[in-house]
Amino acid sequence: MAYVKGGVWTNVEDEILRAAISKYGLNQWARVSSLLARKTAKQCKARWTEWLDPTIKKIEWSREEDEKLLHLAKIFPAQWRTIAPFVGRTAHQCIQRYERLLAEVAGEVEGEDASAVASAPATEGDQFPETKPARPDAVDMDEDEKEMLSEARARLANTQGKKAKRKDRERMLEDSRRLSQLQKRRELKNAGIDTRLSKRKKNEMDYNADIPFEHKPARGFYSTAEEEHENDSERLQHKQMHRTAADAPGPSQKRDKATLSKEDEEKKKEQQKTASAQRTLQLAQLDLQDQISKRRKLNLPEPQIQDQEMEEIVKLGAQGEALHKRYADGVASSLSGDYDDKIVDDSIRTPQIQQSKVKTTIEEIKAMENRSVLGKRTEEEVDDEAEADKDGFAIPKLPSNKAVTSVSAGSDIGGATPAGMTPIKRDALGLVGSVEATPVSILRQKLASLPKPKNDFEITAEDEEEDEEADKEKKPTDNLPVDKGEQARLKRIAEEQERQEALKTRSQTLQRGLPRATVPEVTYNDAIGQEVVALLREEELRFPNKGDSVALMQSEFSLDDLVDAETLIEMELMEGDEQEVQEEGIKTAALPGTVARSDESEEEFKTRVEIISDQLVETLTSLAETCQTEETALVDKFKAYAKRQATLSKKLTSRWSQLESVEVEIAVFSELARMEEIAIEQRSAALQEEVDWLVKKERAAQDKYRELKVKEQAAKGGH
């Protein structure tokens, strides 16, 4: 016969369940149930969530919890797993308490302590044994229970599996390797050999030595980037001077750099993809948060008038209207007033009526269960649910004042309750005096009597600008001494501006950094040629080449004069024919070594140009061949000298480095000798002080011994 799992939980099963959960957690219920032969995974989970969980409250219910439970039961009927988190109890506890409250109102049972009911032991026929206390263990357990207990002990004792043991073994090996490496480095360091654990690759970080994403703050008020750049450049030059040919990178290193650059590019692409995806996700989350924040909770006001009150008002109004119509034409018509449309919208809360809220709520639930039309809620219930406060409680209903009508036409105050009177009186005939003014109405009258504001203001921005200028003048950095580096930087900027201004007055050749043209010795008859020669000579005098000892001349023309002259030249060029000017220039131009002829035709001129060009090409070719021959002969001749120079340079570099190291050692040992001399003097003085102190103490002890000896002899002689 197959055994059906389930039934009452015993104390042994509870302890096994707690131990299994501590090992396997709250997700592997199949493994947990494998330790319990009589329980399934679902039953184990239910036992934990309904009874064994330490967060479950097993004390008696308070009045606030009862109110919250009844209110949520109206909003979420039969949804106990939804109600349980709000109340702070389990779903089964909520069901039991709800049924017990209904039974108490019906008079079936008397009020008892909830903890006493919950602590009642489970029986074999109990429908929910997971919610009851465990049954005590029998003195003589069954064989299957003993087997289950022994198996659970054996399995729970093995706290480490194969993987955990392997991880522990690897961790121990790693610790031993690290300690041995540390001891090796310590011994080498004591021997004077400094070693590193590993060589870091490019774009890698040692998180034990470096600080990731570190941004150091700037030092001082002025930037020292230029000085650091100069120091780096000088340091680089110094390193390049002492670098030998053996330090040149080999083909393997070049390949490593190429592979690293490719890997860096791939990493950058992957980082860009992930960054774009993360940015899209963040934008989507921000949009979702904006939409959630825009959807506000719908808070409806509490109904000011109930159905019963409305019926009473309608009945009273119908009776009054009938009486008014009955005596409208008679003499007594003046004795009754017209009270139509006198219902005021102002809400006045009266003192709360002391009554049992739990009892009232239970009666409402009973009425809701007994109504004929199921599934439909009244407007009163909907308003009650909408008016629930933030803690889940419904605001208690108070007697409404909608039944009270407005005061007489002469009174302009509504909703006040002076001297404990009825808030608003029905006085169509004006029999009652006007209500006294409240402090709020008095304040409103005084505010209304104030003069109207005038909007004739003028805004002057000059004072603000002056204040801003004064604030700028009063900077905290004005009292600080000016940095010399900052002064040099400002001076360089001013000199650069002056140089740019002076450069604008020079010719285009100097502005663009082109080679200068030589001043021809030919005398021109036309005015343009003479002016060009004069400009070239003046430029040589005003802006000589480097190394020329020629006095500078001040410019006779200002920048405005040069701009005007350039404008006139452009206007004159625009008026003439550009192609005609070019043809005339080609005809009148003379090649180097020739003289231009005015009677020469265009074809003769082209033929002469081709002949001279061929001659120039042949001459240049022969010169290039001669230079190459001479260069080859010189290389063969000075090859031994070049090799000798490289060898001597290498030896000189090595000797220089040795000399530097020897000088450093001499300086270090000299300083060490000086410090040792000082230390010897200090130690000698300290030792001398100790010796003097010992001598002094020894003398004092000898004197004391002598005195005691004398006293002893005197004492013996007296006897």
Swiss-Prot record:
Keywords, comma-separated and alphabetical:
Coiled coil, Cytoplasm, DNA-binding, mRNA processing, mRNA splicing, Nucleus, Repeat, Spliceosome
Which is one GO molecular function term here? DNA binding
Read off the SUPFAM superfamilies from this record: Homeodomain-like
Region labeled Disordered — which residues?
Answer: 113-282, 376-398, 446-487
The cellular component terms of Gene Ontology attached to this UniProt record, alphabetical and capped at eight, are: cytosol; nucleolar peripheral inclusion body; post-mRNA release spliceosomal complex; Prp19 complex; spliceosomal complex
Does this entry carry the keyword Coiled coil? yes
Q: Which domain of life is it from?
A: Eukaryota
Instruction: Give residue spans, biased composition: Basic and acidic residues.
Output: 167-189, 253-272, 471-487
Q: Where is the composition biased (Acidic residues)?
A: 459-470
- Name one process (GO BP) from the record: mRNA cis splicing, via spliceosome
Which protein family is named in the record? Belongs to the CEF1 family.
- What exactly does this protein do? Involved in pre-mRNA splicing and cell cycle control.
Kindly state the subunit structure of this protein: Associated with the spliceosome.
The entry's protein name is: Pre-mRNA-splicing factor CEF1
In which organism is this protein found? Yarrowia lipolytica (strain CLIB 122 / E 150)
